[in-house]
Amino acid sequence: METPNQDSGRTPTEQSAANDLSVADRQVNILRDKLRHIDRQLAAATQNNTKLVSMLETAKAEILRLKNALDQEGQPPYSFGTILQLNPRRQPAPGNSGQAATEESADIFNAGRKMRVGLSPLVNINQLTVGQEVLLNEALLIVAGLGYERAGELATLKEMLGADRALVVGRADEERVVRLSGALLAQKLRVGDALSIDSRTGYALEKVPRSEVENLVLEEVPDITYEDIGGLGPQIEQIRDAVELPFLHPDLYREHGLKAPKGILLYGPPGCGKTLIAKAVANSLAARAAERSGNVDLKSYFLNIKGPELLDKYVGETERHIRLIFARAREKASDGSPVVVFFDEMDSLFRTRGTGISSDVETTIVPQLLSEIDGVERLDNVIVIGASNREDMIDPAILRPGRLDVKVKIHRPDAEAAADIFNKYITPDLPFHESDLAEHNGDVQATVDAMVQRTVEAMYSTDKSNEFLEVTYANGDTEMLYFKDFNSGAVVQNVVDRAKKYAIKDLLTSQQRGLRIEHLLRAVVDEFREHEDMPNTTNPDDWARISGKKGERITYIRTIVQGKAGQEPGKSIETTPTTGQYL
C-alpha cells in the first residue's frame, strides 16, 4: 500500500511548509483575538478616562468656588461715599504741589468725614456726577459709581441761588442752602417744588412729585371762546372792556393814568356760565397776546383752583398752597403768556373774617390772598377771577376796588337769552325728523328756529302748569315763582341732552329717525318735574340767596308742584338765626 504522502505526491519539504502555514494562520487568529480584546480594553479605558477627567474638572471647579468663597469671606467690605466735587487732572496751582493737587480725584463724604480720594484706573471720571454714591475699597479708592440715594428729607424749593444752589424750606420752616445733584442740574425747577435732600451732604437729590399739590392747580389752555357762550352778551361786553382794552391799548391807559384791573368777581346763581366766561377770558387774552407779539405759539394758562380742596387741617398748609398757586402764575406769566387764576366757589375759602361757626381759618387765609393779589400789581399778564353764588359771604377786603375791581352779575337767562343758548346746542347739523322738516318745506334752519321758539315759549310760560313756588316775605307780601325763574344755561343744556336721548330711543324702538319738537317739549316737562323736590325750605332765606332771589327776607315757601301731587303743600319755617349763624 502507498502512504498519504505518497498519495498526495508532496515532498517532505512541501509538507513541512504546509504545516508551518497552518500554524501561522492559527497564530494570526490568536493575535487577532488578542487585538480585539485589547481594543475593548482600550475603549473601556478611554471611557473611564473621560469620566475621570469630568470628575476632576468638577472637583477643580468646586475647589475654585470654595477658594473664591474663602477669599470673599476674608476680603474687607466696601464702603459707600457721596461725591461732593470732582477734580479732573489739572496743572498745579502756585503754592500747591503733590499728587492730590494735580491728579484726578474726588471730594467725597464718607462716614461723617469729608475726604479727597483717588479713582481706580477702571473708573471714568466723566461718568461720575456730584451727589452720586460710589463704592470705595479698603484703600478708599473709588472702584465703582452707583446711583443716587432714594431716601431723604422733604423740603420745598423757595428760591434758586444761581445754577447749582437753591434755598429750601424744611421742617418747622427751617431754611437752608443746598447744592443740586447732577440729576437735578438737568431739570427745570420752579418755586414750590418738593425736593428730597440729604442733610448730611447738603445736596438736593431729586424732585418729588406731590399729587396733593398738583391736583389743586389744573393748568390747561382753554379752547372756549366768547362765541361759545350764549345769552350773556352784555356781561361779556363788560368783561372785554375791563380786561382786553388795557391789554390791547396799554399806551392809552398810561396816557390817561389808568391801571388794568387786577381781578374780576363773577357772581350769580349756579349754572349760568361763570366758569365758561373765565375760560373764554383766558382764551381771548392768548389770542390778543399772539397778535401783539406775532408769536402764534403763545399759549394762555387757566389755573383752575379747586377751592374746598385747598383747606387743610394743618396750620399754614392752605396759605402755602395759595403762595404756590401765585408763584406758579408768576412763572407762567414771566414769558408774556396770559395767566388767569380762577377761584371757583370763592365763598368757601375767603368768607368774611369772624363769621366762622366752628373755626377761624379765614382769619389767616384771607390776608394771604390779599397780599398775593397786591403782589400781582407788578405783573401785566396775571388776572384773578373769582366765582361765587354767595358773594355776600366773601370778605369785603377782597371785594374792594384795587383787588377785585370789576364785579359782574351773571343773571338767569330771560327768554331771549335762553333762545340764544338753545341755538348753541340745537344746530342744523343734527338729524331732524321728516315730519318736522316737512312743516318748513325741508328748510333745516327754519326747523331749528321753530323748535327753539316753541321750546322757549313752553319754558317761559306763566300759566298754572308752570307754577313752581309761592313765597311769603317778612312784610306779608306773597309772590308766585314759575319754573322760568329758576332756569339756567345748565338747565337748557340738560333739556337738549334729554331730547337727544329720547330721539335715540325712538330710533332704536320704532325706527323713527331724527329729533322732534315733541322730544324737546317732553324734556322740558321731565326736567321741571325733577326740580319738584329741589327747593330747600329748611332755611328759605339762605336758599333764596343761592338761587338768586334776593331782596325782602323770605319767611315761608309753599311748593306748588308738590301740592298738585297731593303731598304736603308746604310748611312754615322758623328762620331765627342761631348764635354765630351768618345769613
Swiss-Prot record:
Region entry Disordered, spans: 1-22
Ranges in coiled-coil conformation: 24-75
Region of interest: Docks into pockets in the proteasome alpha-ring: 582-583
Keywords: ATP-binding, Chaperone, Coiled coil, Nucleotide-binding, Proteasome
GO molecular function: ATP binding; ATP hydrolysis activity
GO cellular component: proteasome complex
Amino acids binding ATP: G271, C272, G273, K274, T275, L276
Comp. bias intervals (Polar residues): 1-19
Pfam families attached to this UniProt entry: AAA, Prot_ATP_ID_OB_C, Prot_ATP_ID_OB_N
Xref: InterPro entries: AAA+_ATPase (IPR003593), AAA_ATPase_domain (IPR050168), ATPase_AAA_core (IPR003959), ATPase_AAA_CS (IPR003960), NA-bd_OB-fold (IPR012340), P-loop_NTPase (IPR027417), Prot_ATP_ID_OB_2nd (IPR032501), Prot_ATP_ID_OB_N (IPR041626)
GO biological process: modification-dependent protein catabolic process; proteasomal protein catabolic process
Record SMART domains: AAA (SM00382)
Subunit structure comment from the entry: Homohexamer. Assembles into a hexameric ring structure that caps the 20S proteasome core. Strongly interacts with the prokaryotic ubiquitin-like protein Pup through a hydrophobic interface; the interacting region of ARC lies in its N-terminal coiled-coil domain. There is one Pup binding site per ARC hexamer ring. Upon ATP-binding, the C-terminus of ARC interacts with the alpha-rings of the proteasome core, possibly by binding to the intersubunit pockets.
Physiological role: ATPase which is responsible for recognizing, binding, unfolding and translocation of pupylated proteins into the bacterial 20S proteasome core particle. May be essential for opening the gate of the 20S proteasome via an interaction with its C-terminus, thereby allowing substrate entry and access to the site of proteolysis. Thus, the C-termini of the proteasomal ATPase may function like a 'key in a lock' to induce gate opening and therefore regulate proteolysis.
UniProt free text on domains: Consists of three main regions, an N-terminal coiled-coil domain that binds to protein Pup and functions as a docking station, an interdomain involved in ARC hexamerization, and a C-terminal ATPase domain of the AAA type.
Family: Belongs to the AAA ATPase family.
Protein name as it appears in the record: Proteasome-associated ATPase
